[in-house]
Structures are given as structure tokens and as C-alpha cells.
């Protein structure tokens, strides 16, 4: 159990002392700082530290709690050669000029829907069909009703229940449980996730129309298998990437980031919205584009 008597490393103190403003990377900053705090403080203490550091900032409801819970599965391990301050520099800044040019050129949600080889508006594919075709019928899948209720089970053991889950890890797992940073067994950890099968691109700002244009543009660079509405304010674009290393995927992720993508989905065990499922408030995870033909 992390102890609040342990002094924070200087780089963590530096991070906490200089949060960006809303619109300047605050959402990503919360995730990054929470990630390095996990081995040093309890969940409640991390929330308190982030609340204190961002006092007066226009935070979204639940934003800090979500950052803390979402970052735990890829928490920093003390002893790793990591300098979050310098590591952050490798991520490109959002290029608003380039982003606007793409938005003006590439179309909107109507165009994204029209690009789908499988027309999903009248007869949408079921969650079971999508997962069978994209993830495979003989694999281990990690899913959950909430961020904190992850389970990893054989595909057939999930049969008929996946649409009741809010979240899924977009790559198969290799075993039922792995070890977290503090050595505890967990169904969702870097210790039991397999090679990336999909890299999911999510944007935390911009309208649905703008996000659609960005996904259309990115689909010219990589195979877009699925576009799913989060039931809130974003679209999750599933890009097929089986067989590619993180080094090979990094330029694409950086390009997506420069156009407004969140960094959090780079973490291979980050939960994303279940295709065809429902948000906890009942809002559907509508499938806008479904292209199983790109999956080999």
C-alpha cells in the first residue's frame, strides 16, 4: 500500500506545481500525473493532490477520478528510466492550423457513415458479430461494466453478454490475470495484455462533425475497421494494427495527436467503449462505420 509518508520525487513535485490550463493539455496532464502517482499515494490521496493542483480550473464532472482510474493499469513503476517532463516533449502539440485544414477538406459525420462498407444505420451489426469478426472467436477478452470492474474471460464465456458491458480492451489478452505495478493480480494489466490488435483514436475536443473529418483523414493512412460513438462527446476509431510494433505505430499516433487525439489510448490496456453497448446513462454506443474486411 503506498504511504503518504514517502516524499514525492522532485519531478512529480514539478509536475504538480505547473498544471496547464484548459485547452492547453489539462486533460492529458491529469492522466500523466496520476500515472506516476499510483506507486506513491493511495487513490484518495492522488485525487486530493490533483484537486489541489487544479483548484480554480474549469474541470469536467468526474475528470480527475476518471484520470486516476484509467491510468492505474499502465502506472509508472519506480526504477524505470522515465522522466515524465522530458517524455512529454516527444508528444507533438496539437497543430490547430493543420487540424482546421483537415476538417475543411475531409467532410463530416455523413461522409464517415457513407464510407462504411457495411451500412449500419438501418440494421446495425450486433456487438457479438463485431467482436467475433474483429477480435476473433478463440481469444481472451477483457471487458467491464465500469472502469473498475474489469474481467478477462474466454470469448465463448462472454457470449451473449458483451453488449451489457460499457468497456473493452481493444486487443486480446494472453492470460486471465497479470501483475500490476505493485505485484497484485489483475484481469487488466500490462502483464496480461497481448500484442496490439487495434490502436483506438479518440479525441477529447471538437464536435462530432470535426472528429469525423479527422478519422476520415487518418483512414487514408491506416485501415479503419470501426468507428463507435462513445455515447457522450467523442468517436472511437479502431485502426487495425496487428503485427506492427509500437515503434512502427508511433509516427501514426503522433500524427493523430497533432490533429487532436488523446494520448491515453496509446496505453495498450486502456478501456474503450464497447461497440454496440451502452453508456451507464443509457446512451448507445452507436456504430457509425464497420469495415471488417481490413482485418486479416
Annotated model-derived regions:
Residues 225-232, 263-267:
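Short beta-strand
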Residues 182-187, 213, 219-223:
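Alpha-helical scaffolding within the catalytic cores
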Residues 2-3, 76-198, 270, 285, ...:
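DNA replication initiation on ssDNA origins
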Residues 139-140, 225-226, 236, 271:
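Beta-sheet entry/capping signal
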Residues 23-26, 185-193, 225-230:
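Short, flexible, solvent-exposed loop/turn segments with mixed acidic/basic and small polar residues
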Residues 264-278:
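Acidic carboxylate-rich catalytic motifs and surrounding loops in phosphoryl-/glycosyl-chemistry enzymes
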Residues 1-107, 149, 196-220, 230-261, ...:
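Modules that initiate DNA replication and primer synthesis
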Residues 118-121, 219-229:
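Short, glycine- and small/hydrophobic-rich beta-strand elements in well-ordered beta-sheets
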